[in-house]
A protein has these predicted regions:
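N-terminal subdomain of nucleotide-sugar transferases
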Residues: 1-62, 238-240
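Conserved donor-binding/catalytic core segment of Leloir-type glycosyltransferases
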Residues: 18-21, 164, 209-228, 234-238
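A charged, aromatic-enriched C-terminal amphipathic alpha-helix characteristic of glycosyltransferases
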Residues: 34, 342-381
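Short His-centered aromatic/hydrophobic patch
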Residues: 107-113, 134
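A short, active-site helix/loop in glycosyltransferases that binds the activated sugar's phosphate group
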Residues: 158-193
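Short beta-strand->alpha-helix junction loop in the catalytic core
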Residues: 169-170, 188-206, 255-256
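Acidic donor-binding loop of glycosyltransferase active sites
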Residues: 275-292, 305
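Nucleotide-sugar-dependent
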Residues: 285-298, 309-319
Length: 447
């Protein structure tokens, strides 16, 4: 750690402390898990804010290792239905402890949010507001296991003040299925909680050198699963292969040995993945049962690869100006045009990157989310009591004191008395600050 980093840890700030609860569905490669990618981009875009992130992780994840993060080990089962059911109350209580502070909980796993809040509020001193991010719903037409967790997901959402969701299409699907189980008052509450947040791209990630050169590669960089219509895509590629044999199909997430002469599943690190996308002629965005945002599509577009897209509302939300198909023949006609007409392909490449830059700038979404953070924290109840004034005087006299010291030496109350309102009162005081570090420290600053 360099001197600058040491100094940064001692700088008084009005730190916002966020506890992040994970949702891991791709344990084969945690760095590529969609939750990890989303959270990493959030932290990067909010790096200039005074936020410290405490992240529960099944193992250390390099991609979430920043100056303003810590990772606490929290094991989760790998099978999704087991992962959504398993919650170790006593281990969670020990992890969050009394020595840490949390102004906000961000739950990426709605199915656990009730257990999470129940444990925090009833077994610890913490009572923070809860915000969420929904990565997955067990929709009736998608769920492949014998018993779904949809109702548990909805009950978890109802514990939140706000929960972000990828697309309006997906939100509509949630509300529609929820009507089968919940009354209209609850549906209205869900409608208020669920907030569409598009997963845009960072401006600096958009290709700036517009080169029309490319290879005749069709990329399918989605998960090769049934809910992404992978089988139907391969059948379409078989038909295209019957027409012409001058192309390859790259499916980077395909495991095992490719079983077609045109298939490749080359693996790269993230930069290598981006570099490979730059060489592709066209990407394929399939019909999907889930209605979510396609990070795979924006990955390709920002690297200069245009995509043809299934004519679904979720893709129109991403870019209404793309080339859409509804039938196999329409898809084949479009693929042939992109493979043969370099000028047209280059035109669509340019239009796509311009759209990303002007309409899907992730920084704008993150500024809105940060304001949501501030609004929720500002609405957290604070105390105004003799004990509050006593704590203020202690911090003033000591100059600085850690949360552990303050709690052990001057509080001494049971878990029935909640700390969060006292922290809120301290942080609202004009002369009291925290530090951007894993250990909370209250600092008196007259400036």
């Amino acid at each position: 750690m360099n001197i600058f980093e040491l100094d940064k840890e001692l700088i008084p700030t009005k730190t916002t402390r966020v506890l992040v609860y994970p949702n891991i569905t791709w344990q084969k490669d945690l760095e590529q898990d969609s939750y990890v990618q989303v959270l990493k981009n959030m932290i990067r875009e909010l790096k200039d804010k005074d936020i410290f992130w405490t992240i529960l992780s099944p193992q250390h994840i390099d991609g979430l290792d920043f100056d303003n993060t810590e990772q606490l080990m929290w094991e989760l089962p790998t099978y999704p239905p087991a992962m959504r059911s398993h919650f170790d109350v006593m281990k969670f209580k020990k992890l969050v402890g009394h020595d840490r502070d949390f102004d906000l909980v961000m739950s990426h796993l709605p199915e656990h949010t009730h257990q999470l809040v129940n444990t925090l509020y009833n077994l610890t001193h913490h009572t923070p507001k809860v915000i969420g991010y929904a990565h997955w719903f067990d929709f009736d037409h998608v769920c492949v296991w014998a018993k779904d967790s949809f109702k548990q997901n909805i009950c978890g959402l109802l514990e939140m003040d706000k929960c972000y969701i990828n697309t309006q299409t997906q939100k509509n699907m949630v509300l529609e299925q929820a009507r089968n189980h919940f009354n209209l008052q609850t549906i209205h509450q869900l409608d208020e909680i669920l907030t569409v947040q598009y997963l845009g791209v960072k401006e600096e990630d958009i290709l700036k050198e517009y080169e029309p050169e490319h290879e005749k590669i069709i990329v399918f960089n989605h998960r090769p699963e049934s809910y992404k219509h992978y089988k139907e895509f391969i059948q379409l590629m078989d038909e295209l292969w019957e027409q012409r044999k001058d192309f390859t199909v790259w499916v980077p997430l395909l495991t095992g040995e490719p079983d077609r002469p045109y298939l490749t599943n080359e693996k790269f690190d993230k930069q290598g993945y981006y570099d490979k996308l730059k060489t592709c002629c066209v990407g394929f965005s399939p019909k999907q049962k889930y209605g979510g945002w396609s990070v795979a599509t924006t990955d390709g577009m920002m690297n200069g690869c245009p995509y043809i897209m299934y004519d679904g509302e979720y893709y129109h939300e991403l870019w209404d100006g793309a080339d859409f198909f509804t039938t196999d023949q329409e898809a084949l006609d479009l693929l042939n045009r992109y493979l043969d007409d370099s000028d047209y392909r280059f035109e669509m490449q340019m239009l796509g990157m311009h759209h990303l830059s002007t309409k899907l700038n992730y920084k704008n979404e993150m500024e809105t989310m940060y304001q949501d953070f501030c609004d929720l924290i500002n609405n957290t109840k604070s105390t105004n009591s003799d004990k509050t004034n006593e704590l203020i005087e202690v911090i003033k006299d000591r100059g600085s004191i850690t949360k552990r010291e303050l709690f052990n030496e001057y509080c001494g109350w049971g878990r029935g008395i909640k700390w969060t309102p006292y922290r809120r009162a301290l942080m609202e005081h004009p002369n009291i600050y925290d530090v951007n570090n894993s250990e909370p420290k209250y600092i008196w600053s007259a400036s």
